[in-house]
Amino acid sequence: SNMFSGDLIQMGDIYASELDYNENYTKKQLDRIADYYQIPKRKKKKAELIEEIVIYENDLSNYEITERRKLLWFYMEEINNDNYLSKFLILD
């Protein structure tokens, strides 16, 4: 039963990630994440893209690239929120 509770926790994490992407990210932002991971995005609806991103990010073999992507996105957000540096970062 220990394995079962671990599976439930992971399912909760996956659901939380899907909810976060759905509530807090635009389709354009999700397209950028998919591009970074080289996930094909042609003709995919937002929900389909979210599902693929979450599956990708929860695959242990993608741990390093996922952490790097999250760190770089955090840096972009920080730069974007800085009055001086935001002038040099152009995010459309």
Region roles according to the model:
Residues N2-D92:
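Basic helix-extension-helix modules of the SAP/HeH family
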